[in-house]
Amino acid sequence: MRRDYTLYLFAALGTFLIAYIAVPIAVIFLKQASDVEMLVKTLHDPYVIEAIRNSLLTATATALIALLFGVPLGYVLARKDFPGKSAVQALVDVPIVIPHSVVGIMLLVTFSNSILDSYKGIVAAMLFVSAPFTINAARDGFLAVDEKLEAVARTLGASRWRAFLSISLPMAFPSIASGAIMTWARAISEVGAILIVAYYPKTAQVLILEYFNNYGLRASRPIAVIMVSLSLGIFVILRWLVGRKNA
């Protein structure tokens, strides 16, 4: 029997990509380990702590807003056919392909000074670029739920709202949760749109760029290490919680 090396080839190709992602993460931690003094100094810098807090809070607020509006939209896209549905679905994906500096210009032109240099501006920029992940995940989650289950619940006397809460939402939850996690992750990584809309109050993403431009790599690297650590930690915990929910 002829030996099939397809899986070995795929594994080798996949390993290259995993290494491409993992190696820079490992290297930045190893480099910072040789400069603990700068890391400790950064951890005690109130300006840095405030910027990190701003990033975490605004990214979390963005994910919650995306859930509030994205889950209902995802449900409608999964359950109903209507004129212009394809256009709506295409529009949902548009923020993914628009350059983020352009997003910042668009938001600034649209909302002007009402979002300039404010928490509202940060959340607005984050929401624009990250909401598609929640909407698409919710839509896919509801599409995976057999609509007949809702119909059976309604024949037994449940309202559409009740059927949604008791059947569709719990069954689609893993997909929705994954979308929310990706929304949060995308939001906390946003820089381009925030630079234009809300340079202040400072977020960690913007502060890293500012420190790099003004003080060089040694000053910006500790903040990057802190953000990678926090993001990875939160991401792993959230994925674990979703995995437990699926089990």
UniProtKB/Swiss-Prot annotation:
GO BP term, example: transmembrane transport
Pfam families: BPD_transp_1 (PF00528)
Ranges in the topological domain labelled Cytoplasmic: 1-8, 77-90, 136-163, 244-247
Domain ABC transmembrane type-1 span(s) in chain numbering: 52-238
SUPFAM superfamilies assigned to the protein according to its UniProt record, in alphabetical order: MetI-like
Subcellular location: Cell membrane
Record carries keyword Transmembrane helix: yes
Keyword Oxidoreductase: no
Membrane topology category: Multi-pass membrane protein
Entries under InterPro entries matching the protein: MetI-like, MetI-like_sf, Mo/W_ABC_Transporter_Permease
Main location: membrane
TM ranges: 9-29, 56-76, 91-111, 115-135, 164-184, 223-243
NCBIfam families linked: tungstate_WtpB (NF040839)
Record note on quaternary structure: The complex is composed of two ATP-binding proteins (WtpC), two transmembrane proteins (WtpB) and a solute-binding protein (WtpA).
Name under which the protein is recorded: Molybdate/tungstate transport system permease protein WtpB
